[in-house]
Regions:
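Beta1/beta-strand and adjacent pyrophosphate-binding region of the FAD-binding site
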Residues: 1-9
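Conserved Rossmann-like nucleotide-cofactor binding loop
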Residues: 9, 32, 130
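N-terminal FAD cofactor-binding segment of flavoenzymes
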Residues: 16-67
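Short beta-strand to alpha-helix junction loop
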Residues: 69-89, 126, 202-211
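Predominantly flavin-linked oxidoreductase catalytic cores and closely associated redox partners
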Residues: 93-227, 244-246
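FAD/FMN-dependent oxidoreductases across multiple families
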Residues: 174-175, 199-282, 287
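C-terminal helical "tail/cap" subdomain of flavin- and related membrane-associated enzymes
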Residues: 279-392
Length: 392
């Protein structure tokens, strides 16, 4: 089999397949390039086989919408070089091609930019947001999560979080601007460093990074924080409403699938947990041929229950995109007032239909008439074409 994309999802799946005895190849234009993103997940989502050393910091989750509250959940921030080293160790025996995949012209064939064609029983697109094997015409404008962050010394960032704490969301308008709502995200990284980030959860199209940079500096200034001129920065921009990967004869995996939670942007925990399951489905069914194996793998990534939950979450995303900016903090206040089991299910349980329906039903019943309208309207209307009329 052949996996396109040597990011966390692709590396995890390629390694899992190799461990089960499947001859595996991995294709990436720069397979050894260091991963630059910051990754975190809730502690109960950590895969059981992930070494303890891959977790750089653990912190108690806190949110601020209309009020300030602790979530009662622990957030794990990963040591990304350690994660990459761990997953790379699993690639022993995997044949790696440093090349760019340009398509799958026919079943079982992967075309590379240099004209080479690789033969494989199963081809997986784990190429992230680029989805190099899902060559479809661009449709409507996509919604994106964007963020601008800075890496600061923990003492400099001390006014924002207490020791042992992670600020998951702070919706207070301390950035001093009207227009599209954004929140502050602050997490400890270990080693005395903290990431402070101004984030637009979702917008169609994504909120420009210069806007987020400006807001972050204004927000930090309110706390007397002046970042050093040489502070390292993080720039984030990724689509949160890609349609499901439907390229013929290809399995989409990771962000390419997309396994991204439409309402949070998280996908790593799901990808790491699914990788061994997908590998097992392929290994069990390949003796029957590529088609049964591909079907089994696709059903592992997208069982009917996961498709239903993904649709419900997409409706939630559209509700957020249509919501007047002034109502967004009140919406999140209502959401975080939900019983813990409902919050946890909506944020993490990708195939629990009954649990997600119960969470949304509870949210609807607890909401006032105005918020109920915001929740129902997206289910009755087509996706909003653009948020551009809203000031940014």
């Amino acid at each position: 089999m052949c996996v396109v994309g040597a990011g966390p999802a692709g590396a995890a799946l390629a390694g899992a397949c190799q461990r089960l005895g499947l001859a595996t190849a991995l294709v990436d234009v720069a397979p050894d390039r260091p991963w630059s993103a910051t990754y975190g997940m809730w502690t109960p989502e950590l895969p059981p086989d992930l070494p303890a050393g891959v977790v750089a910091a653990r912190a108690e989750g806190r949110v601020v919408a209309l009020t300030d509250r602790l979530l009662g959940w622990e957030y794990a921030v990963l040591d990304v070089p350690a994660l990459q080293a761990h997953l790379s160790e699993g690639l022993s025996g995997v044949r790696v091609y440093a090349s760019r995949a340009v398509g799958s012209p026919r079943p079982g064939v992967l075309a590379l930019a240099d004209g080479t064609e690789l033969q494989a029983s199963i081809i997986v697109d784990a190429g992230g947001q680029a989805r190099p094997l899902n060559l479809r015409r661009r449709g409507r404008e996509r919604a994106a999560q964007t963020a601008y962050g800075m890496f600061l010394d923990e003492q400099l960032a001390a006014p924002l979080i207490e020791p042992g704490e992670a600020l998951f969301m702070d919706w207070r308008q301390e950035h001093g601007e009207d227009g599209w709502p954004t929140f502050l995200y602050v997490i400890p990284l270990g080693g005395g460093r903290v990431l402070v980030e101004e984030t637009s959860l979702a917008r169609r199209p994504g909120l420009p990074l210069p806007t987020l940079h400006r807001r972050l500096r204004t927000r930090l200034a309110r706390y007397g924080i002046v970042p050093p001129a040489d502070a390292a920065v993080e720039r984030v921009a990724f689509t949160v409403d890609h349609p499901r990967h439907r390229a013929s004869g290809v399995l989409g995996f990771g962000a390419a699938a997309p396994l991204i939670h439409p309402a949070t942007g998280f996908s790593l925990a799901t990808s790491l947990r699914l990788a061994p399951q997908v590998a097992a489905a392929l290994a069990a069914n390949l003796p029957r041929g590529p088609k049964p194996a591909l079907t089994a793998a696709h059903d592992t990534v997208w069982p009917r229950s996961a498709r239903i939950v993904h649709h419900l979450r997409r409706v939630g995303l559209e509700a957020l995109l249509r919501m007047p900016p002034a109502d967004v903090p009140a919406f999140f206040e209502q959401f975080f007032e939900l019983p813990e089991r409902h919050r946890w299910t909506y944020l993490t349980a990708r195939d629990d239909v009954a649990g997600n329906v119960a969470a949304l039903t509870h949210l609807f019943r607890a909401s006032n008439r105005r918020l109920r309208g915001h929740l129902v309207r997206p289910a009755l209307l087509p996706p909003l074409p653009s948020n551009e009329p809203v000031l940014n």
